[in-house]
């Protein structure tokens, strides 16, 4: 794997004008990632501001009810901000600060990454502009309000389908014009190199902690690690420290209303090779290669592609990727809430649902770790509308 590619995936498919900013970012990242002052500062904020390490919790009642493997939950829902997004938000914002940048640009769909960027910007005294499709601004009013409270400016994007992919285009356009003093803070393991590597590294704290915690709790590594996959950062973060171990890595995509309906967001299961957002990966696209609309009950999984390292892990056979439907995810949401007193994000509920599917087929001494990537408060409206399953 050369630096820029994971197998054949990844790369830098960007206009000439972005090559220089990306080079500068790569150089800065390589310099600061081993810099003691940078790492001590990041460590300090992760511990005292964000609340790391997060617990690894044995879901005893759920495990016993299913009657198979032991299910452990990596509690990223307890992180400041309510989801794993904070790890990358503070990591990249601090990197930008060390690079001498004074402004952060982000794009957001469901608003979670926008909130994480706004939080980090407020903490470090940086200006934050968040691009958001006008459609999403309507759908995610609370997160728009939250970003405003944190001092960020939300810029609604009226072009194209007025959703995430249009927000991405606007954010890139802004960065080309302002990179001297702005950093483009990408929210997942996507985009042109070096972003997939940077985001994976900042999220790997999840897997490093989980690995230590399970060895302490059980004296052995898990048999399987399960995480939901949209762009793929929470999954990459928990998978990466286990890649060289004999551990099944299972990514769960949004099956929506079923793959056969076309209403889903499962790029690894149903997508084609393509180039978008500066990278070569799997995308949901039509015959003309245009990105097609996605559907999921969970707004955070509806990215139309997937990070290049996941594409590589799939093609190499190191990880397996499955789908869970809206209905199965909602069922898992209710089951975890009632059995363990934890309301998961609908994204994370996809991973819980798949763990619930495989646990009964496994032995009682086998172990599954589920990355509980976020809490469910933001989804209560949707759950109320959909009703009980």
Curated annotation (Swiss-Prot):
Q: Which GO terms describe its biological process?
A: L-tryptophan biosynthetic process
* Record carries keyword Amino-acid biosynthesis: yes
Cofactor field: pyridoxal 5'-phosphate
**Reaction(s) catalysed by this chain's protein:** (1S,2R)-1-C-(indol-3-yl)glycerol 3-phosphate + L-serine = D-glyceraldehyde 3-phosphate + L-tryptophan + H2O
Q: Does the keyword Amino-acid biosynthesis apply?
A: yes
Q: List the disulfide bonds.
A: none
**What Pfam families does UniProt report for this protein, alphabetically?**
PALP
Q: Which Gene3D superfamilies match?
A: 3.40.50.1100
One cellular component term (GO) for this entry is: cytoplasm
Q: In which pathway does it act?
A: Amino-acid biosynthesis; L-tryptophan biosynthesis; L-tryptophan from chorismate: step 5/5
Q: Which GO terms describe its molecular function?
A: tryptophan synthase activity
- For this protein, what is the EC number? 4.2.1.20
Alphabetically list the UniProt keywords.
Answer: Amino-acid biosynthesis, Aromatic amino acid biosynthesis, Lyase, Pyridoxal phosphate, Tryptophan biosynthesis
**Annotated positions of the N6-(pyridoxal phosphate)lysine modification:** 85
What InterPro entries does its record include? Answer: Trp_synth_b_CS, Trp_synth_beta, Trp_synth_beta/beta-like, TrpB-like_PALP, TrpB-like_PALP_sf
Q: Which family does it belong to?
A: Belongs to the TrpB family.
Please name the PANTHER family in this protein's record: TRYPTOPHAN SYNTHASE, TRYPTOPHAN SYNTHASE-RELATED
Function statement: The beta subunit is responsible for the synthesis of L-tryptophan from indole and L-serine.
**What does the subunit section of this Swiss-Prot or TrEMBL entry state?**
Tetramer of two alpha and two beta chains.
Protein name per Swiss-Prot or TrEMBL: Tryptophan synthase beta chain 1
Q: What is the lineage of its organism?
A: Archaea, Methanobacteriati, Methanobacteriota, Thermococci, Thermococcales
